[in-house]
Amino acid sequence: MFTYYQAENSTAEPALVNAIEQGLRAQHGVVTEDDILMELTKWVEASDNDILSDIYQQTINYVVSGQHPTL
């Protein structure tokens, strides 16, 4: 049996958001929060890996909750 423990201070979400932001900025020049959320949503839907899907979903929650600095 596995027990899930929420990390106090996770660094995965900000790092993933920053990577997505850099990639989208290189492609489009301008990035909004909606752009990042749409990209993460595509990744969740395209992933066959439950662990990655969970990470992407947690990152969506992180962005929506307003924890990420304004773009």
UniProtKB/Swiss-Prot annotation:
GO biological process: positive regulation of bacterial-type flagellum assembly
Induction summary: Expression is reduced in biofilms and is repressed by a high salt concentration.
Protein name: Protein bdm
InterPro entries named in the record: Biofilm-dep_modulation_Bdm_put (IPR019625)
Annotated source species: Escherichia coli (strain K12)
A Pfam family that the UniProt record links to this protein: BDM
Top-level taxon: Bacteria
